[in-house]
């Protein structure tokens, strides 16, 4: 589930502390360590400078990688330092990895009351089709839910006031109820006014929260599953 899509900034300056002598790592070819067409990065750094000067806009950064990204090792350090310096726009893209039976970062938790079928971009099982996180989950049990709880850390508050759910949407998909521990925030009708495919549904909340529950709900005999990608 997308919990307030992450936005953060960084602005770097070269100093003596950033420089490592070539003698320390003689096997590195520093001449080959060159950015091609660095001028294309200037708009990016201009936005970072605006954030540093107090601008309230958001800058989204997509960090692509392998299982080390999934476990949030490097990406957590980068995200934390960016947000501590330039402002915290939220935890960003999360997926219920624990529910899917794999490793999960330590700054949020996922749980469910049912078992989910998992489709991963690695391996031979790609049913359901993997989504933006490289993985998707599906349940055929009405009433099955996924809980997401964000955890504050390093003086960063990861409460959120909106959710963007990436999901399959057609006449065969369950409807979904989106709630916190007390309030009903939204209701997703999977077959309403849409062609078949993958969709993003945005749900605003009435107040910040660290918890959301997405619950599948069968409302017609034709519905047989719920499929989530992010």
Where are the model-predicted features located?
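N-terminal secretory targeting modules
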Residues: 1, 9-64, 68-230
């Amino acid at each position: 589930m997308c919990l307030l899509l992450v936005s953060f900034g960084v602005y770097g300056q070269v100093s003596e502390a950033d420089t490592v002598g070539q003698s320390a790592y003689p096997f590195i070819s520093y001449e080959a360590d060159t950015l091609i067409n660095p001028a294309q990065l200037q708009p990016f750094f201009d936005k970072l400078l605006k954030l540093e000067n107090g601008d309230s806009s958001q800058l989204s950064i997509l960090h692509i990688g392998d299982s080390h990204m999934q476990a949030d090792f490097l990406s957590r350090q980068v995200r934390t330092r960016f947000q501590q310096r330039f402002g915290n726009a939220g935890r960003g893209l999360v997926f219920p990895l624990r529910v899917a039976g794999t490793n999960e970062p330590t700054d949020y938790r996922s749980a469910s009351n049912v078992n989910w079928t998992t489709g991963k971009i690695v391996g031979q099982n790609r049913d359901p089709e993997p989504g933006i996180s490289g993985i998707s989950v599906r349940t055929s049990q009405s009433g099955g839910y996924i809980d997401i709880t964000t955890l504050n850390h390093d003086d960063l508050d990861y409460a959120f006031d909106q959710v963007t759910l990436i999901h399959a949407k057609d006449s065969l998909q369950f409807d979904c109820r989106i709630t916190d521990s007390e309030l009903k925030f939204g209701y997703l009708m999977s077959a309403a006014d849409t062609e078949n495919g993958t969709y993003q549904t945005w749900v605003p909340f009435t107040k910040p929260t660290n918890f959301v529950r997405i619950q599948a709900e069968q409302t017609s005999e034709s519905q047989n599953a719920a499929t989530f990608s992010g």
